[in-house]
């Protein structure tokens, strides 16, 4: 696992064929995800639910990692808005708390998956690979 962390260090040159939009209001959580992903795909950030909708509309993405607890608009409501415009994009919900009611609300809103924080790198990569098999880890 330590080598996984080292392997993901580097810069994002915006030349990958895949873009992942990370909707995360906690900067440390975003930086962790970005560090893991940036050598494999383009990474976009949204810090609020409303910013997520704007970034997605303006730039698009191939997959969204979406925190359930977001300011201005929570992740479930943001997902419902995304599903009104795009029913196909994979959306993986994240939460620090794996409450069954959160997972059920995420599924009902159209989530494609659910991961918990603290991030398990293997679980994250496996979940993303289900929807974006072209990413090479």
Whereabouts are the PLM-identified features?
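Non-catalytic signal-transmission and effector/linker regions of two-component phosphorelay proteins
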Residues: 1-21, 42, 122-137
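Two-component/phosphorelay signaling modules centered on CheY-like receiver
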Residues: 26-44
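Acidic, metal-coordinating helix/loop segments flanking the phosphotransfer/catalytic sites
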Residues: 45-63
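Acidic catalytic/metal-coordinating carboxylates
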Residues: 48-51, 74-77, 110
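Short amphipathic alpha-helix used as the core "switch/output" element in two-component signaling
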Residues: 54, 76-87
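Receiver (REC) domain active-site loop signature in two-component systems and cognate sites
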Residues: 70
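Alpha4 helix (beta4-alpha4-beta5 surface) of REC/receiver domains from two-component response regulators
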Residues: 77, 98-115, 126
């Amino acid at each position: 696992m330590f080598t996984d962390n080292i392997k993901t260090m580097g810069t994002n040159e915006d030349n990958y064929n895949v873009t992942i939009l990370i909707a995360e209001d906690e900067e440390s959580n975003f930086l962790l995800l970005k560090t893991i992903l940036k050598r494999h795909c383009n990474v976009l950030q949204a810090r609020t639910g409303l910013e997520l909708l704007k970034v997605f509309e303006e730039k698009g993405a191939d997959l969204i990692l979406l925190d359930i607890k977001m300011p201005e608009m929570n992740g479930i409501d943001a997902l419902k808005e995304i599903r009104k415009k795009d029913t196909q994009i994979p959306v993986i919900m994240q939460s620090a708390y794996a409450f069954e009611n959160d997972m059920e609300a995420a599924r009902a809103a159209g989530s494609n998956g659910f991961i918990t924080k603290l991030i398990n790198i293997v679980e994250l990569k496996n979940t993303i690979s289900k929807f974006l098999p072209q990413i090479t880890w």
